[in-house]
């Protein structure tokens, strides 16, 4: 079972892989990379549900190993 990550951990991984903050609406922040991929991260949240983390991994195009799974 993958470990649960907080939104700060997810944001750190995204920024390390070239994503930058674009905008925020309510509690959801939008991050975008140079290739145009967009990932939406609910913020602030101590622990994200596993399904939400998997969705962010898919949106970003990164591998689960990049997030420490």
Question: Which residues are covered by each model-predicted region?
Answer:
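Basic nucleic-acid-binding interfaces
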Residues: 1-24, 28-69
């Amino acid at each position: 079972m993958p470990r649960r990550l907080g939104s700060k951990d997810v944001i750190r991984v995204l920024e390390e892989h070239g994503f930058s903050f674009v905008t925020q609406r309510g509690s959801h922040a939008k991050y975008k990379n140079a290739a145009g991929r967009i990932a939406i991260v609910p913020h602030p949240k101590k622990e994200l549900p596993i399904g939400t983390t998997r969705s962010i991994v898919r949106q970003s195009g990164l591998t689960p190993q990049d997030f420490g799974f």
